[in-house]
C-alpha cells in the first residue's frame, strides 16, 4: 500500500508536466493550422488559450484529488472561516515580503543575476503582458492547480509514508524545483513550506490556495503599478512578514494542542 503512495507524487507531477505541454501544443496547432489565425494575432490573444488550458488542468487534477481521497472524506477538516481566510492572505503577503528580500540579495550575487533576469522576463511574458490575462492565469488559475497538485496530492500522499515535517519539506522542494529557476525555486519552496503547514493543520485546500493567491497578486501588482505605488507595496509586504510568522506559528501550536488531546 505504501508503495502506491510513494509513486503518486512522481506520477502526478509527471502528468501535470506532460498534460500542460500537450495542451499548449494542441491549442497552438488548432489556432494556427486549423483556424489559420495569423501568429501575430494569436500571440496577442494567447492568454485565452492559456486560460482554457488551466481550466482543463483544474478539472483534471481536482477530479484526481477527489478520487484519491474519496474514502477519507470523514477526516477532520477546518471549515472555511473569516479568521483563517484572513490569516492565509496575511501569510501570502508576508511570504511575498520575504521573497522580495531574497530577490534583492540574489540581484547582488553575480552567480544568480542571470536567473533573476530570466525570472523577470518570464513574469513579464505571462499572458503576453495583458493585465486581465495575467490576473486570470497567474493569480487565479495557477494557485488553484498548483495547490491541488503539490499540497492536495503530493504532500498528502507523502504523509502516508513520512512524518509531517518531511512531507512538507520534500513537497515544497519539489514545488520549488518545478519552477526551473534557482531564484524562483528558493522563494517558491519557502512559500510551499508555509502553505504546507496550513494545509497539514487545517486539511482545507482553500487556505494554501489563498496564500498562493496573495503572493501572486502582489507580484502582479508590482509588475503593473507605477514606481510610487510599488514603493508602498514593498513597505506593506515587509510589514506583513511579522504577522505572517505569527499566523504560521499559531497554526503549529494549535496543531500540537490538538495532537496531545
Label every model-predicted segment.
Residues 6-14, 48-57, 85-90, 125-145, 232-237, ...:
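Hydrophobic alpha-helical transmembrane segments
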Residues 145-170, 197-204:
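Membrane-interface helix/loop boundary segments of multi-pass membrane proteins
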Residues 14-68:
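Alpha-helical transmembrane segments in multi-pass membrane proteins
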Residues 1-18, 44-48, 69-101, 160, ...:
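Interfacial transmembrane-helix boundary/kink motif in multi-pass membrane proteins
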Residues 37-45, 72-142, 160:
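Juxtamembrane helix-loop-helix connectors linking adjacent transmembrane helices
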Residues 66-73, 247-261:
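Membrane-interface capping segments at transmembrane-helix boundaries
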Amino acid at each position: 500500500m505504501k508503495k502506491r503512495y510513494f509513486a503518486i507524487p512522481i506520477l502526478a507531477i509527471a502528468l501535470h508536466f506532460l498534460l500542460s505541454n500537450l495542451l499548449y501544443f494542441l491549442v497552438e496547432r488548432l489556432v494556427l493550422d486549423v483556424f489559420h489565425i495569423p501568429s501575430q494575432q494569436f500571440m496577442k490573444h494567447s492568454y485565452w488559450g492559456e486560460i482554457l488550458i488551466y481550466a482543463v488542468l483544474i478539472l483534471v487534477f481536482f477530479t484526481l484529488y477527489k478520487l484519491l481521497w474519496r474514502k477519507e472524506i470523514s477526516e477532520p477538516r477546518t471549515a472555511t472561516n473569516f479568521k483563517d481566510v484572513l490569516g492565509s492572505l496575511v501569510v501570502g503577503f508576508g511570504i511575498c515580503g520575504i521573497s522580495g528580500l531574497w530577490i534583492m540579495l540574489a540581484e547582488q550575487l553575480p552567480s544568480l543575476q542571470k536567473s533573476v533576469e530570466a525570472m523577470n522576463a518570464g513574469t513579464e511574458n505571462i499572458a503576453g503582458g495583458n493585465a486581465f490575462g495575467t490576473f486570470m492565469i497567474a493569480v487565479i488559475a495557477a494557485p488553484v492547480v498548483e495547490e491541488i497538485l503539490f499540497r492536495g496530492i503530493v504532500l498528502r500522499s507523502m504523509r502516508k509514508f513520512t512524518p509531517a515535517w518531511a512531507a512538507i519539506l520534500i513537497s515544497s522542494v519539489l514545488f520549488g524545483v518545478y519552477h526551473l529557476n534557482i531564484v524562483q525555486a528558493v522563494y517558491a519552496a519557502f512559500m510551499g513550506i508555509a502553505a504546507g503547514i496550513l494545509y497539514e493543520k487545517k486539511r482545507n485546500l482553500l487556505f494554501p490556495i489563498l496564500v498562493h493567491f496573495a503572493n501572486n497578486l502582489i507580484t502582479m501588482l508590482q509588475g503593473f503599478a507605477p514606481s510610487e505605488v510599488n514603493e508602498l507595496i514593498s513597505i506593506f509586504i515587509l510589514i506583513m512578514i511579522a504577522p505572517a510568522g505569527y499566523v504560521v506559528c499559531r497554526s503549529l501550536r494549535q496543531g500540537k494542542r490538538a495532537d496531545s488531546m
